[in-house]
């Protein structure tokens, strides 16, 4: 097959790293794979994996008919079989490019915590959690597949030479004491609350523990994060919080940590490095990954919703105060997390599932009449969405990561997902 993969951007972030690594795995299985997108730091990763990169046209608003036309032209001239968009703007652009070309199929992957209702319901959709898949099937999506965020377990593992000493030297991180690391985009939606409460939690730990919180990432909330870090460092009289910014290769940040905090793909990469993981969510949610909590995360994804922001810092403080001094417990939890990733989230398994999705998308058995009505339904959702966004901008309530701002996160029994499922 000839496949074009279109991440939503090429800045450092979980969804786009997953897209590129999975494209590389599919390429290694003998399929021609092109990465299309707006140039950014991850273009270098695309090239390291031996993939061709094609720059998308620069447009002000997304989705863009200019991008859709560029995709359609590329599909025609390169005889591409699959146009694969990650997140909703690329998904719509791929869909528009493919809809008048019966030999080309569009597919969509959404790794956000909720799916935009205006992605046409007959478009093959991949999501990252069983909970989201159930919600989407319940609203009539006909082709929903769960593909949990894959991890390259060879490129992300203990024992690699990742210039860890240089990272410590550059940011003044002492070999003594403990390092708690979070690798995250500094987004106001989904991420900011947890990052701020993590700083407060670490600042409240006993001074004798000498805990350093290493934050690797950048984004629109950098000013708020930087301001809080400065306050914490003044209050504690030392460099309690290190704000390292966006690292071209953040693997060293995972590796130097004694404990990692995170959600989604970042949480899984922390596990690949054999680190104890405290899963970050919203409304004060923090939970340590253990054999007993694994089932929850296999159902709802590596994320959660707590009972309120006010208790977040104290909840995390309690977890850290228990596991940081317990070296044996940390080793056991790290080994458990590594085994979960190896058995359930390997890149090779994900590539095989992805190829099955592509093959099904190319199957000519489809109903054009049903597709027509579902397009009308999707168009109605999109127009209502645009109207709400315009109203939000006018009232100052606009959000950049809009579908991460309304995540699917309902409570549900998880008896079907046990620690045994990791194997």
Where are these regions (language model features)?
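Conserved donor-binding/catalytic core segment of Leloir-type glycosyltransferases
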Residues: 4, 151, 166, 174-192, ...
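N-terminal strand-loop element at the rim of the active site
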Residues: 5-13, 19, 24-63, 219-224
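Short His-centered aromatic/hydrophobic patch
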Residues: 85-91, 110
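Donor nucleotide-sugar binding/catalytic pocket of nucleotide-sugar-dependent glycosyltransferases
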Residues: 115, 122-162
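A short helix/loop element that forms part of the nucleotide-sugar donor recognition site in Leloir-type
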Residues: 157-173
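Nucleotide-activated donor-binding/catalytic signature segment of Leloir-type glycosyltransferases, i.e.
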Residues: 226-247
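A short, well-ordered alpha-helix in the C-terminal region of glycosyltransferases
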Residues: 329-344, 356
